C-alpha cells in the first residue's frame, strides 16, 4: 500500500478525512519531502472526488523558509497545491509573495505576527509559521476545517510536542533518517525543550557513533524505535476513564472510583505523589506529563503492576532508559487518547554523514517496527 493509501485507510477507519501530522525525529530527515509528497499525491489515489476537497496546511512552529535558521543549510521549500488553505503568520505570508490570498483572521499570534487563513492562488513556495501551544494548534486545525479544508496536514517536529498530540491530529507520520546521528542536526532538544523524543535521544545519544553502515543504521533504528515506543502508548483499558475529560491527577481504585491528588501539579512533587498514592490503586492518572522526577520516585518506591495513565504519548517526558525501567517493573504507560503512528519515512542521506544503502535502512526499520516504512525518494 502507498503512503497516501495508508491515509485513505485511516479515513475509512475513522469515517472522516484524517488530520495528519508529519513529524521529524531530527533536522534533515526528510520531513518536508514527506509533506510535499503527500500534498502532491493526496488527490491521485482512490476517489477522484478527493481532489475537489481543499487540503489544509499549518505548522506547529515555523517551516518552509529558504535556509535553516540554525545550520544555514538550504531547506526544501513547501509547495501546497493551488486551492489549498494555509494557516500561517502575517510575516510568513508576506514572504510567500503572491502565492497566498487572505481569507480570514484567527485569534492567534506568533512572533511573526497574527496567524491568518490564506488560500493558495499560485504554485509557488510558501512559508508556514503557526502557533505552538496545544490549544492554539488544535484551534487552528478547527478553523481550517471551518473554512473548507477537508483534511489538515500539520508540519511538526518531535520537539514541538503539540504537533503529534491526539488533540490536534488523528494520525502521525514519522520521518526519520541518518541525520539523527549528525552533531547539531540530529540532537533533539537543543533549544532546551526536553520533550518526548529529546528525552529519548538524551538517553541514547552518548553511545559512540558506529564505524560501519550497518552499525550506524542500527543506531538510527534504536533511536527511532525509542521515539515510536514513547509516542504510541496503548490505550488505557480502564473504562472509568473512557470519554472522561477528568482534569485531575489522582488514583483509580478497584471498582472505578477516582481519588484526586489535591496538591495540584506533580512536576516537582514526585516523592510526595508516590507517598500519597493509595496502596490499592490500580492506576495513577496524570493530568499532565510523566516527568523524570515522578518516574524516578515511582522506581524508588516498591510499587509494581501499576498502570500510569497520561493524556497521550506526547506527555512522556522521562528519559528513554527510565521509560524502559518502568516497564520492566510492571509500571506500564497507557494513554487516555492514544496517538496513531501510521507510517515511517526513511532518509538514508545526511548533510554530515555518508549515505547508507536505502534498502538496508528501510529493511532494518521494517524489521524493528510494526509499521510500514517508505523511502519516498528511492521508491516514490
Label the predicted regions.
Residues 19-25, 118-130:
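Short, basic, glycine/proline-bearing loop/turn elements
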Residues 20, 56-58, 170-173, 342-345, ...:
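Hydrophobic/aromatic beta-strand patches that form the interior of the parallel beta-sheet core
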Residues 1-10, 63, 99-122, 336-344, ...:
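A noncatalytic interaction/capping subdomain that flanks phosphate/NTP-handling catalytic cores
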Residues 38-120, 331, 367:
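N-terminal phosphate/diphosphate-binding loop that engages ATP/GTP or pyrophosphate donors
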Residues 3-65:
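Walker A (P-loop) phosphate-binding motif
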Residues 32-35, 66-70, 164, 184-186:
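Short, glycine/acidic-enriched capping/hinge loops at junctions between secondary-structure elements
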Residues 133, 137-367:
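Conserved catalytic-core segment of NTP-binding enzymes
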Residues 57-60, 309-314, 372-380:
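A generic structural motif
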Amino acid at each position: 500500500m502507498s503512503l497516501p493509501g495508508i491515509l485513505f485507510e485511516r479515513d475509512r477507519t475513522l469515517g472522516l478525512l484524517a488530520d495528519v501530522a508529519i513529524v521529524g525525529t531530527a533536522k534533515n530527515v526528510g520531513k518536508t519531502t514527506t509533506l510535499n509528497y503527500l500534498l502532491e499525491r493526496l488527490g491521485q489515489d482512490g476517489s477522484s472526488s478527493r481532489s475537489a476537497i481543499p487540503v489544509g496546511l499549518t505548522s506547529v512552529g515555523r517551516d518552509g523558509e529558504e535556509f535553516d535558521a540554525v545550520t544555514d543549510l538550504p531547506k526544501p521549500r513547501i509547495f501546497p497545491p493551488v486551492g489549498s488553505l494555509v494557516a500561517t503568520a502575517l510575516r510568513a505570508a508576506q514572504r510567500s509573495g503572491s502565492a497566498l490570498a487572505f481569507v480570514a483572521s484567527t485569534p492567534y499570534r506568533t512572533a511573526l505576527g497574527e496567524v491568518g487563513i490564506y488560500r493558495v492562488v499560485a504554485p509557488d513556495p510558501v512559508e508556514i509559521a503557526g502557533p505552538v501551544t496545544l490549544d492554539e494548534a488544535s484551534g487552528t486545525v478547527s478553523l481550517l476545517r471551518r473554512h473548507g479544508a477537508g483534511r489538515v496536514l500539520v508540519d511538526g517536529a518531535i520537539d514541538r510536542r503539540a504537533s503529534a498530540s491526539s488533540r490536534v491530529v488523528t494520525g502521525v507520520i514519522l520521518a526519520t533518517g541518518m541525520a539523527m546521528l549528525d552533531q547539531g542536526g540530529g540532537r533533539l532538544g537543543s533549544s532546551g525543550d526536553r520533550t518526548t523524543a529529546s528525552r529519548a535521544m538524551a538517553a541514547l545519544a552518548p553511545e559512540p557513533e558506529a564505524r560501519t553502515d550497518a552499525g550506524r543504521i542500527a543506531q538510527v533504528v534504536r533511536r527511532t524505535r525509542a521515539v515510536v515506543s514513547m509516542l504510541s502508548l496503548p490505550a488505557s483499558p480502564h473504562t472509568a476513564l473512557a470519554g472522561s475529560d477528568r482534569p485531575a491527577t489522582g488514583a483509580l481504585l478497584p471498582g472505578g472510583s477516582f481519588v484526586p491528588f489535591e496538591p495540584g501539579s506533580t512536576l516537582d512533587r514526585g516523592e510526595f505523589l508516590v507517598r500519597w498514592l493509595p496502596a490499592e490503586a490500580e492506576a495513577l492518572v496524570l493530568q499532565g506529563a510523566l516527568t523524570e522526577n515522578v518516574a524516578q520516585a515511582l522506581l524508588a518506591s516498591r510499587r509494581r503492576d501499576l498502570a500510569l495513565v497520561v493524556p497521550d504519548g506526547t506527555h512522556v517526558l522521562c528519559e528513554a532508559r527510565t521509560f524502559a525501567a518502568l516497564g520492566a517493573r510492571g509500571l506500564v504507560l497507557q494513554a487516555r487518547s492514544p496517538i496513531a503512528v501510521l507510517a515511517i519515512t526513511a532518509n538514508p542521506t545526511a548533510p554530515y554523514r555518508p549515505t547508507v544503502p536505502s534498502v538496508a535502512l528501510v529493511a532494518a526499520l521494517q524489521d524493528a517496527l510494526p509499521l510500514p516504512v517508505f523511502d519516498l525518494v528511492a521508491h516514490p
